[in-house]
């Protein structure tokens, strides 16, 4: 068994039971964004979170243990994503990545935006021309040090 087997079991239970990520997140006690990432194998659950997931998805003790192991993050199956929605993010970074980098450096200096001390919020934004997806990414600024 490995983390991908647990992820597949979670997805199957979610579909079978008609669950929504927002409801799963409420039961586990964290944001829908973080819980979704965790259920998809990208975050480490605490024992309490793993037990809550275990109740929701009828997981075994071994499967709950896998949720508590630090995963291999960013483990998409291909270098360039083929899923259209994920590919749009790849495209956004390809087109706007240098702009984002320049503007962050201009505002903060030489450093990076953390993906560890990080939060994300995804909301629906009503628009008469067609609803929009609003994504807010917030990462701590980390300055490179000289030595």
UniProtKB/Swiss-Prot annotation:
Q: Which Pfam families match?
A: Cyanate_lyase, CYNS_N
Keyword list (alphabetical) reads:
Lyase
Q: Catalytic activity annotated for this protein?
A: cyanate + hydrogencarbonate + 3 H(+) = NH4(+) + 2 CO2
Give the EC number.
4.2.1.104
Judged by the first EC level, this protein's enzyme class is: lyase
Active site per UniProt: 88, 91, 114
- What's the domain of life for this entry? Bacteria
A GO term, aspect molecular function: cyanate hydratase activity
Q: Which biological process terms from the Gene Ontology are attached to this UniProt entry?
A: cyanate metabolic process
Segments spanning the bilayer are none
**Belongs to which family?**
Belongs to the cyanase family.
Q: What HAMAP family does the entry give?
A: Cyanate_hydrat
Q: Per its database record, what is this protein's job?
A: Catalyzes the reaction of cyanate with bicarbonate to produce ammonia and carbon dioxide.
Task: Kindly give the NCBIfam families that the UniProt entry links to this protein.
Answer: cynS (TIGR00673), PRK02866.1 (NF002773)
This protein's name? Cyanate hydratase
């Amino acid at each position: 068994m490995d983390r991908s087997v647990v992820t597949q079991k979670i997805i199957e239970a979610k579909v079978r039971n008609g669950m929504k990520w927002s409801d799963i997140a409420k039961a586990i006690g964290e944001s829908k964004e973080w819980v979704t990432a965790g259920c998809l194998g990208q975050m480490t659950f605490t024992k309490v979170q793993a037990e809550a997931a275990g109740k929701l998805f009828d997981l075994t003790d071994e499967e709950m243990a896998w949720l508590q192991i630090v995963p291999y993050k960013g483990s998409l199956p291909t270098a360039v994503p083929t899923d259209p929605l994920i590919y749009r993010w790849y495209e956004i970074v390809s087109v706007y990545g240098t702009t984002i980098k320049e503007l962050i450096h201009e505002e903060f200096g030489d450093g990076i935006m953390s993906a560890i001390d990080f939060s994300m919020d995804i909301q629906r934004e009503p628009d008469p021309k067609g609803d929009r997806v609003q994504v807010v990414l917030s990462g701590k600024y980390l300055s490179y040090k000289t030595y």
